[in-house]
């Protein structure tokens, strides 16, 4: 792979790479390592977090192969966020932070003023490197009024689906009827027997071009033993909650654009362990699909202008993670159709073997912005 000025310029064979390398190129031999796009977090709330806590989060996720983060914060959280980014950039280089402004319970005039106040931090010569404002986050009942603000400011509209998916989906679909070009997403969605993510809703979201961010976190534990049991059941897709794998599989079948890791909690399971869980679940999805929902799907959820961001293609940002792995294969959730293949004509990426007996990949390094 040839990287220049922070962008992927070419991907091909070893022989092709050697033929185009010249004295100006710095050559890194992979020695059997695996290169993948760095992982991206779909939504992580930093409200009420001080700068050291935000910095700890960014560093912990960097060690797990993450570079891009969509962070949910209020105006009062911005100073701590900027401080954390300054420390992080000095040690690791500039991160890729997509900020969604929490506008729940915020009056329209106050929201417009907040967006104007953030513009110098994200757009002009005084801007914080790596920080961009991409959207506003509201409750379902606030979506109609916020949609006008988002459209006028050229921002996406994120609707909170953590407490009621049906209400959030209905609100998003209603907004779409009057605003055909507004970027709309549902965040922190889960499916429960009382509030299911139905196939009908998934089809409607796909047809309306509304993206879906699925939560992968367990609900925060309450003090009672029963609530703790329910929290454990939820992550496994027990009686209290449909598994993430099952929802993702149905969303893929409906053609709904999804991303994983859109959560109401700051910390979520790491990407490789999550992919392994999704592949090995009885209602699982392929490793390729799970990987895409933690990379390319996150950028689509953020309505990235370049549709190929999150994969290795010419003129995409070079957010590259290098991993040490034991073996690669094409993996499907059904072991009867899993197969070993190295034929590039199949255009199916080989990913690390992720069965329960295999070790997870170990991060060796991250390359970003040519660093």
Segments from the language model and where they lie:
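Active-site microenvironment of metallo-dependent hydrolases
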Residues: 1-5, 9-20, 47-69, 73-74, ...
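Phosphate/diphosphate-binding loops
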Residues: 97, 101, 128-140, 183-201, ...
């Amino acid at each position: 792979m040839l990287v220049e000025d922070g962008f992927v310029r070419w991907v091909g064979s070893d022989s092709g790479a050697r033929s185009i390398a010249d004295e100006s190129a710095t050559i890194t031999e992979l020695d059997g390592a695996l290169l993948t796009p760095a992982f991206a977090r779909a939504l992580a709330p930093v409200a009420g977090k001080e700068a050291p806590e935000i910095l700890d989060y960014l560093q912990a996720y960097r060690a797990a192969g993450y570079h891009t983060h969509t962070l949910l914060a209020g105006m009062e959280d911005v100073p701590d966020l900027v401080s954390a980014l300054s420390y992080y950039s000095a040690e690791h280089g500039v991160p890729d932070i997509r900020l969604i402004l929490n506008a729940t319970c915020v009056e329209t005039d106050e929201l417009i003023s907040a967006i104007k106040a953030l513009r110098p931090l994200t757009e002009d010569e005084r801007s914080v490197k790596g920080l961009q404002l991409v959207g506003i986050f509201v409750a379902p009942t606030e979506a109609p009024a916020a949609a006008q603000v988002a459209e006028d400011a050229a921002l996406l509209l994120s609707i909170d689906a953590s407490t009621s998916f049906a209400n959030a989906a209905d609100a998003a679909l209603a907004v779409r009827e009057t605003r055909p070009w507004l970027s709309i997403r549902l965040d922190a969605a889960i499916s429960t027997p009382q509030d299911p993510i139905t196939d009908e809703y998934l089809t409607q979201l796909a047809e309306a071009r509304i993206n879906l961010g699925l939560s992968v976190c367990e609900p925060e534990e309450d003090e009672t033993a029963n609530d703790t049991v329910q929290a454990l059941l939820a992550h496994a897709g027990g009686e209290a909650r449909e598994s993430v794998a099952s929802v993702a599989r149905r969303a893929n079948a409906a053609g709904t654009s999804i991303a994983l890791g859109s959560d109401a909690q700051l910390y979520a399971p790491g990407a490789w362990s999550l992919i392994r869980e999704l592949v090995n679940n009885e209602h699982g999805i392929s490793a390729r699909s799970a990987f895409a929902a933690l990379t390319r799907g996150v950028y689509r959820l953020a309505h990235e202008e370049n549709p190929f961001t999150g994969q290795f293609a010419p003129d995409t940002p070079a957010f590259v993670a290098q991993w040490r792995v034991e073996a690669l294969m094409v993996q499907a959730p059904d072991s009867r159709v899993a197969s070993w293949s190295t034929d590039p004509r199949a255009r199916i990426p080989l990913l690390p073997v992720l069965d329960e007996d295999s070790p997870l990949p170990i991060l060796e390094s991250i390359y970003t912005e040519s660093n």
